[in-house]
Amino acid sequence: MATVSFTQMKHGTRQDYAMLQALEHSFYTKTAQRLHDELERQGQDSIDGYLISRLEHGLQSATRAWRDGANDDWVVAALLHDIGDGLAPQNHDRMAAEIIRPFVSEEVTWVIEH
């Protein structure tokens, strides 16, 4: 596998960054799969004491939003609003907002963040 020629970003060449851009594009196209994988983890690794897993909670929230006629942005936000809970339980709201920010409206992002 090709690698960059630098150890500090400021020393990168045009060729380094062209190669990285192509590799990053490939990585970005797998975002949905990584989110799916994290949702599956939420079904397996949830906080004790609750009647349902974090995955079930997200699915219930998204289903309720969809049944209420919410647009896709709100349904996605309802599904993913706790996506950061496993890594950042004290500030998972901000983490979730940053994850969905490129894909949904600013209003939806703001609600998830706050």
Q: How would you describe each model-predicted region?
A:
Residues 1-114:
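Metal-dependent phosphohydrolase cores
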